[in-house]
């Protein structure tokens, strides 16, 4: 595995690889890799001749009161996870390398961002789309891999890739969970012992809602109210949202049908956790 820290070298490598006909699987991350990221890397390894992993904590996607400075970082651990999962190139640029001067252009996302996490984090998805536009141009991937834990992000990325005719296939990868159902996340380290015991109730609330939908409930408000009440009963967390939308359009639905997402965000003392399920309802 080769570690690359400059845009110029990474772009030179990927241009040569693509010119020689090699397929490139790309996994963009902010580091502090866990089993969820490893799953993305293994999927990329299965489907491509070359795997490129990026580790970059992107300042553009953090708001003024968010956790940029305390976002967990451990490059030695990330290198080990990368090597264990067959990465060929680890792209590890500095902020100065990615943004040598103030951006004169950013990508503004106008749909799919005014709900869920986007409602709470104005500018977040513009930051995500801007850094991905840069990373796609640097790594020139055939396929790029994203976990469905950030399902809104996946919907936004699929939209912007289609809108700008970017020649990359976006591959959705299912959420990876702990044995008790908690979605794996770099931010889980911020949970206290007591909160860690409560956190699996996020997924349990979604499973309960799914059972009600499969039993015939079609009223979206009834389902989201059930989820909120369940989380408020079984955790000390504060429900930020529990919402149901069409997916991937993220349009509001009153009656549940077609492809939908049920998504939640819950604030604990030092961390905000998100989770979701997607399902097709006939």
From Swiss-Prot:
Misc. comment: The reaction proceeds by a bi uni uni bi ping pong mechanism.
Family: Belongs to the pantothenate synthetase family.
Gene name of the encoded protein: panC
Residues bound to ATP: 30-37, 147-150, 176, 184-187
Metabolic or biological pathway, per its Swiss-Prot or TrEMBL entry: Cofactor biosynthesis; (R)-pantothenate biosynthesis; (R)-pantothenate from (R)-pantoate and beta-alanine: step 1/1
UniProt keyword terms in alphabetical order: ATP-binding, Cytoplasm, Ligase, Nucleotide-binding, Pantothenate biosynthesis
EC assignment: 6.3.2.1
Keyword ATP-binding in annotation: yes
Residues of the active site: 37 (proton donor)
Residues annotated as binding (R)-pantoate: 61, 153
Sequence positions that bind beta-alanine: 61
The protein's name: Pantothenate synthetase
InterPro entries per record: Cyt_trans-like, Pantoate_ligase, Pantoate_ligase_C, Rossmann-like_a/b/a_fold
Keyword Ligase: yes
PANTHER family linked to this entry: CYTIDYLATE KINASE/PANTOATE-BETA-ALANINE LIGASE, PANTOATE--BETA-ALANINE LIGASE
GO molecular function: ATP binding; pantoate-beta-alanine ligase activity
Record's function text: Catalyzes the condensation of pantoate with beta-alanine in an ATP-dependent reaction via a pantoyl-adenylate intermediate.
Catalytic activity: (R)-pantoate + beta-alanine + ATP = (R)-pantothenate + AMP + diphosphate + H(+)
Organism listed in the record: Bacillus cereus (strain ZK / E33L)
């Amino acid at each position: 595995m080769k570690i690359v820290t400059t845009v110029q070298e990474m772009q030179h490598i990927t241009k040569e690889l693509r010119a020689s006909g090699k397929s490139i699987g790309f996994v963009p991350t902010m580091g502090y890799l866990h089993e969820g990221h490893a799953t993305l890397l293994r999927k990329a390894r299965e489907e491509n001749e070359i795997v490129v992993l990026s580790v970059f904590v992107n300042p553009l996607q953090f708001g003024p009161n968010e956790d940029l400075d305390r976002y967990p970082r451990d490059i030695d651990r990330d290198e080990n996870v990368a090597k264990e999962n067959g990465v060929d190139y680890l792209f590890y640029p500095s902020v100065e390398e990615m943004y040598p001067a103030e951006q004169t252009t950013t990508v503004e996302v106008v749909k799919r961002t005014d709900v869920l996490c986007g409602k709470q984090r104005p500018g977040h998805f513009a930051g995500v789309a801007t850094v991905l536009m840069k990373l796609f141009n640097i790594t020139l991937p055939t396929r790029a891999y994203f976990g469905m834990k950030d399902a809104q992000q996946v919907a936004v990325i699929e939209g912007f890739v289609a809108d700008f005719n970017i020649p990359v296939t976006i591959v959705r990868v299912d959420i990876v969970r702990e044995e008790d159902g908690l979605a794996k996340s770099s931010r889980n380290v911020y949970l206290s012992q007591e909160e860690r015991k409560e956190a699996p109730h996020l997924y349990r609330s979604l499973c309960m809602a799914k059972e009600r939908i499969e039993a015939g409930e079609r009223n979206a408000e009834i389902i989201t109210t059930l989820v909120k009440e369940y989380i408020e009963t079984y955790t000390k967390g504060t429900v930020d949202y529990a919402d149901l939308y069409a997916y991937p359009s993220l349009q509001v639905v009153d009656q549940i049908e077609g492809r939908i997402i049920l998504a939640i965000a819950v604030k604990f003392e030092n961390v905000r956790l998100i989770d979701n399920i997607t399902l097709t309802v006939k």
